[in-house]
Amino acid sequence: MSVMFDPDTAIYPFPPKPTPLSIDEKAYYREKIKRLLKERNAVMVAHYYTDPEIQQLAEETGGCISDSLEMARFGAKHPASTLLVAGVRFMGETAKILSPEKTILMPTLQAECSLDLGCPVEEFNAFCDAHPDRTVVVYANTSAAVKARADWVVTSSIAVELIDHLDSLGEKIIWAPDKHLGRYVQKQTGADILCWQGACIVHDEFKTQALTRLQEEYPDAAILVHPESPQAIVDMADAVGSTSQLIAAAKTLPHQRLIVATDRGIFYKMQQAVPDKELLEAPTAGEGATCRSCAHCPWMAMNGLQAIAEALEQEGSNHEVHVDERLRERALVPLNRMLEFAATLRG
């Protein structure tokens, strides 16, 4: 019998909320970061779920704001010798795996991910050992050690296409760690998938009753849903997709009002894409319920201006990402497979 870590019973150590900065402090750190980026030959790579002021700074300094797949592509191809990764720890690890010659800095190395935390490598290895006939596909939201055990790494933007491809080859699949995304992909492809039972603490909190009430209040609104959400939420969607796919859907849908079921950090780029449309947050708490994340990842919120300035100024172990070389080489194989497969989709 396989060992299975139970994320539902795990207690994730949420970080304290960052201390708000004054307007003057923000201006000071913004200018300091711009100067340090030039001095360090560094570029910012920020995820859609970071705070708007972080995304804006990445834009202004020639950096990248994107989903995890494009973050990986951008960082590997950019000529900068240092990458400042504003996101969570697995994103910094992925950057180091793909660009070992570069210095990878993060505002904090304590920025976790509930999907990563919910898939400890020892338990996952035991799970895989119990099913040796299955191809192991892991989501990008995993540690370097879990990636090293995988045959494939995948992001939500290409998950359906990859699993459909593997299914066409007759392969049976282990999917980890997100149970909701795994269920969505299985439903879309009909593939034989055995799912690990992890979940994103942000998307797992969306509630159908509260979303139904909001839909009744705004009957002309389209509902956009990330597939890390529970199936009942996905079933209510007019569009389902990764962060980049949801932004694209916001542009193509005719609706002038959009209810968005993903981390509210996406609103910065989505509003740029559809400046004339109204964006509404999908509710994360139902009747008598409270939210822990409240539609914003608490670890993404750790990527503040002060922490970014400190990362660029203070070289060393507090901010620099390191990955064991043997582990890196093993994790690079499924990551490269992902990038090569994604390239075939782009034509």
UniProtKB/Swiss-Prot annotation:
Binds 1 [4Fe-4S] cluster per subunit. The keyword Metal-binding applies. Signal peptide: none annotated. It is an enzyme of class 2 (transferase). Its cofactor is [4Fe-4S] cluster. It catalyses: iminosuccinate + dihydroxyacetone phosphate = quinolinate + phosphate + 2 H2O + H(+). It comes from the Bacteria. GO terms for biological process: 'de novo' NAD biosynthetic process from L-aspartate. Keywords: 4Fe-4S, Cytoplasm, Iron, Iron-sulfur, Metal-binding, Pyridine nucleotide biosynthesis, Transferase. The keyword Cytoplasm applies. Its EC number is 2.5.1.72. InterPro entries: NadA (IPR003473), NadA_sf (IPR036094), Quinolinate_synth_A_type1 (IPR023513). GO terms for molecular function: 4 iron, 4 sulfur cluster binding; metal ion binding; quinolinate synthetase A activity. It holds the Pfam family NadA. GO terms for cellular component: cytosol. Pathway: Cofactor biosynthesis; NAD(+) biosynthesis; quinolinate from iminoaspartate: step 1/1. It is found in: Cytoplasm. [4Fe-4S] cluster binds at residues 113, 200, 297. Iminosuccinate binds at residues 47, 68, 139-141, 156, 226-228, 243. HAMAP family: NadA_type1. Catalyzes the condensation of iminoaspartate with dihydroxyacetone phosphate to form quinolinate. Belongs to the quinolinate synthase family. Type 1 subfamily. This is Quinolinate synthase. It comes from Escherichia coli (strain SMS-3-5 / SECEC). The gene is nadA.
